[in-house]
Amino acid sequence: MDPCDCAKTGACNCGATCKCTNCQCTTCKKSCCSCCPSGCSKCASGCVCKGNSCGSSCCQ
């Protein structure tokens, strides 16, 4: 997992093909920038955020 600056820039680049925008993640994960909203301590396995939103079932 590569660190990213979503919290600062709202965007990160995970490898050559994956980009995450309008996101509040603090780390990029292998599953193309899965991330948690700032109110979530962690995301459930397989959770993928679209934009800066994430289903409540993702948040743990």
UniProtKB/Swiss-Prot annotation:
Beta: annotated span: 1-28
Residue numbers binding a divalent metal cation 5: 33, 35-36, 49
Annotated binding of a divalent metal cation 4, by residue: 32-33, 43, 47
Positions of a divalent metal cation 6 binding: 36, 40, 43, 59
Binding site for a divalent metal cation 7: 49, 54, 58-59
SUPFAM superfamilies, A to Z: Metallothionein
Keywords, comma-separated and alphabetical: Metal-binding, Metal-thiolate cluster
Protein's UniProt keywords contain Ion transport: no
GO molecular function: metal ion binding
Gene name per UniProt: mt
Sequence positions that bind a divalent metal cation 3: 14, 18, 23, 28
Domain of life: Eukaryota
Pfam families: Metallothio
Disulfide bonds: none
Protein name (Swiss-Prot/TrEMBL): Metallothionein
Function in brief: Metallothioneins have a high content of cysteine residues that bind various heavy metals.
Family: Belongs to the metallothionein superfamily. Type 1 family.
Location of region: Alpha: 29-60
InterPro entries: Metalthion_dom_sf, Metalthion_dom_sf_vert, Metalthion_vert, Metalthion_vert_metal_BS
Residues noted as binding a divalent metal cation 1 in the record, renumbered to the chain: 4, 6, 20, 23
Metal-binding among keywords: yes
Domain commentary: Class I metallothioneins contain 2 metal-binding domains: four divalent ions are chelated within cluster A of the alpha domain and are coordinated via cysteinyl thiolate bridges to 11 cysteine ligands. Cluster B, the corresponding region within the beta domain, can ligate three divalent ions to 9 cysteines.
Binding sites annotated in the UniProt record for a divalent metal cation 2: 6, 12, 14, 25
Originating organism: Carassius auratus
PANTHER family found in the cross-reference section: METALLOTHIONEIN, METALLOTHIONEIN-1X
